[in-house]
Amino acid sequence: MKIDKKSNSLIKRRELLKKTAAMSAFLVVPRHVLGGSAHIAPSDRINIAAVGVGGRGRSNIQSCANENIYALCDIDDGKVAETLGEDWAAPFVGKTKLYRDYREMLENEPEIDALIISTPDHMHTPIAASAMDLGKHLYIEKPLCHTVAEARFLARRARETNIVSQMGNQGHAEEGGRLINEWVADGALGAVQEVHCWTNRPVWPQGIGRPAGSDPIPSTLDWDLWVGAAPFRPYLKDRYHAFNWRGWMDFGTGVVGDMGAHIIDHPYWALDLDLPTKVSASSSRFGANLETFPLASKIHFEFPVKGSRPPVKLTWYDGGLMPERPEILEQERMMGDRDGGVLIVGDKNTLMHGVYGRDPRIIPETNHSDYQKPAPTIARSPGIHQEWIDAIKDRSKMTTSHFEYSGQLSETMLLGNIATVRASENKVLEYDGANMRFTNDDGANTLLDKDYRAGYGLV
C-alpha cells in the first residue's frame, strides 16, 4: 500500500483507541472516548457527520435524518446551502456544525459516532482511513473505493477497528435481491455458468482528453480540497465538479465502478462468486493519455468452481453495448429496464432482472408462473441506511453490504477497469486473488494501487 506518513496524530489516536478499548471492560467511559464503536442505546440518536453533501450525499443524509445530523463537511459551500435549504433539513439549520476540511472536523468533533462519505470516488478511502482510526462507523456511497488495494485496506481496517460498515448500493437491501438469492438456491435455474450484465451509462463525458487552460475558481469552492488525494490539476468549469468526475481516471471508476455495484451485485451475491481468476476486455478508444475511461466497453470475468457450483463467466456491457436478446423472451417485453439489466442463464431456466435487482422474473413468463416459489429464507431488510443505523445501536445485528462483501465486489469491478486499460495487450489477465497480483502482466500490477498527494495518505 502506497501510504503517506505525514500525519502522526491519527497513528497516536489509533494506539489510544486500542488501549481505551482494552480498558473499557473495567471502566464506564463516555462514548466519544471510544469513538463510534462504543455502545449506543437503541433509544439514543446517533451523532452522524456527512462528508460530501450534494447529489447522493444529500439523499444519504435525508435517509438518516431521524438521527442527529451533527456535522456537514463539503468543499463547496453552495452544496451545503442547498442541502440545508431542504424542508427535511430544517431541524438541523443553525445546529449542525459546518466544515470544509474533513480532517479538521474529525480533529475537532470527538462526539461524532458515524460518518457518511459521498465524495468523488478518489477520496472515499483517505477519509475512511482517518475516521476508522477514531472508531467511527462508516457508510460509504458506492463504489466503495478507487483501487484494488483500497478495497483490501477498507475490509482489513474495518475488522481491526470493529466498526459497523456499509456500502451504499441500496438495491442490495431491496426485496428483489433476496428473491434472486432464494430462487437460485432453490435450484430454479439449475446449474448457472453464464451471466450477462449491462447498463445505459455513461451519461457523463468519457473517451476525451484533458482540455488546456483553467477557469476562475468560484468563491464558494475550495478546489485544492476537492482535488484532494489526486495529482493537482487546474479548475475547469463543469469539467469535473460536481458530476462529471465519474469518467476521469484520477477521480472516478468509470461505468463499471459506478453501476456495477447496482447491477453485478445480485448475481455476484446469489452465486457466491468471490474473485475472478481471469479478466479480459475490449473497448472503444480511451481519452488521450488514458485520462478518461472509454465510451463503451465489454468485460469478461471468469470465476472458478466453488463447491457444487460450476465455473461462471460473467460479461459486462456498457456504452450502448448489450448481450444478444434471448429467443425465449417475449417480443413485447423489454430486456431488463431502461437503465440496464441482468440475465442469469442456467441449464433449466433463465432469470432476468432490472437495475438494483428489481422485478426479477424467470423467462418466459409461463415458466415464471409455473415455478413454485420457496418460502423466504433470507431476512428482509429495513433499507440500506436503516440496516446500518440498527447495527450501530445493536451490535448483534449485521449489515449486508459490509466492507468484507462490498470490498470483494468492488475489487472485482476494479479488476475489470484494469483489464480495459490493458486491453491493447490482447491478453486474458490471470489473477491470483490470494496474493493480490496478476501472474502474467506486470504492467497490470502497477494499476492495483496508486500514490497519494501529501496529507491524504492512508495512515
Which sequence ranges carry the predicted segments?
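Short, solvent-exposed loop/turn elements at domain surfaces
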Residues: 56-60, 80-82, 108, 204-206, ...
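A contiguous active-site-proximal alpha/beta segment in oxidoreductase catalytic domains
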Residues: 137-139, 145-220, 225
